[in-house]
Amino acid sequence: MATKIVIDAGHNGLSDPGAVYNGRRESDDTLRLAMAVGEILSRSGYDVDYTRTGNINQSVIQKAQLANDTDADLFISIHRNMSEVPGSYHGVQSLVYDLNGPKLTMAEAINKNLEGVGFRNINVEARPNLAVLRRTKMPAILVEVGFIDNAEDNKLFDTRLDEIAQAIADGIMDTLTSIENEASDGQPAAEKPVDRPLYRVQVGAFYNLQNAIDLEQELKRMGYNTWIVTA
C-alpha cells in the first residue's frame, strides 16, 4: 500500500493555540486526535506523516509546504469549531477546497461516521480561502470535530476519543479502498493536483506591535488564518 497521508493537528500550541474556551485549547485537542487517527492508519498499512507531534511554532503555510515536500497523496487537518455565542452551535463540519472529486466523497464519509458516534452532521462546505486547502497540491480535507464551547460536544470528544479517531480513519480508508477498486476497474477516480493562484490580503499595518497582535487575535476569532510579518 503506497498511499501517503499527512495528518495535521490544527494550530501549533505555542503562538497559535486556536480556539480557547474556559482554559481548553483547540491545539491540545487536535493533537490528541490527530495522533490517534494517524496511529490507526499506520497500523492499517498506510504511510503516515504528521505536521507536528508536539507544540511548535509553525504557520499554516509551513504545514501545507510540509505536505507538498513529502509528496503526500492526502492531507487531513483536524480542528475544532467555536461559535460567537458559547454553546449556541454543535456538530461536525468538513471543509474542502471545492465540492468535487474524491475529497468530497471522503469528507461526506467522515461526517457520516462521526454522526454515528453522536455528533450532529452539519455539512461539507467549500472554503477555497483556507491556506491548508488552497496551498496543498494533493486532495485535502479540514475536519471540524465539534464545538469547543459546547458541553455535549466536549463530552463526546473526551469520552469517545478512540471511536472518533476510528470514525475518521474509517472514512479515509473506505474512500481510498473504493478509489482503488474503481481504478482497477478502469474507471477514472483519482483527483489530479491543480496549480492554484495565491492571493495575499493585508488588513493593517502598525508601528505598535501590540496593535498588530490585537488585530491578529480578532481575525483568528473570526476564523481567518493570520500571521504577523515585519516590513
Predicted regions and their residues:
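Short, solvent-exposed mixed-charge patches
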Residues: 1-2, 231
